[in-house]
């Protein structure tokens, strides 16, 4: 969930924040409202960080999904211009906004450090948790294996994502 939210902390650090919140809000609740206030403070301290984390993950997912069609179009345009898939990922990471730029930049760095392209893309899907992204990555993997016009496939996927988003809004 921490990666889904884009938070650069580990689970141990997050649990420390929860623990400190429980203690701090419990003490404050006791000082200002006796034992019942302490119980309320402990409860709030235990659940508030998870609620904030969940909300941040939801916002980030919505932001990435909102950028996905444009990101795929940037990659497709770069492929049409004759660039390799990695160069196209680099273009997307530079041209699009955060948080998608950071995620695609991370994929590119992982591949450059020796990670298999399919594995890096699958890790992206795991981190983000978007069904549309999973569909796009599956299309990329299939197209890379069987060959063909990846730019055309990405444009089709991007257009389909846009159409689905339009239907969701209605």
State what each model feature region is:
Residues 1-73, 94, 129, 165, ...:
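Hydrophobic alpha-helical signal-anchor/transmembrane segments
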Residues 70-167:
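Glycine- and small-hydrophobic-enriched helix-loop-helix hairpins
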């Amino acid at each position: 969930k921490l990666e889904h939210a884009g938070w650069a902390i580990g689970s141990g650090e997050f649990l420390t924040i929860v623990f400190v919140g429980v203690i701090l809000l419990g003490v404050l609740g006791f000082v200002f409202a006796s034992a019942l206030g302490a119980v309320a403070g402990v409860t709030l301290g235990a659940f508030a960080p998870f609620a904030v984390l969940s909300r941040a993950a939801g916002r980030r997912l919505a932001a990435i999904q909102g950028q996905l069609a444009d990101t795929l179009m940037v990659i497709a345009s770069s492929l049409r211009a004759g660039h390799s898939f990695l160069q196209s990922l680099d273009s997307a990471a530079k041209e699009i906004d955060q948080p998608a730029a950071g995620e695609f930049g991370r994929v590119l760095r992982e591949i450059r450090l020796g990670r298999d392209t399919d594995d890096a893309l699958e890790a992206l899907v795991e981190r983000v948790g978007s069904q549309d992204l999973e569909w796009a990555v599956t299309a990329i993997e299939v197209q890379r294996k069987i060959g063909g016009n990846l730019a055309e496939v990405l444009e089709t996927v991007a257009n389909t994502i846009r159409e689905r988003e339009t239907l969701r809004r209605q």
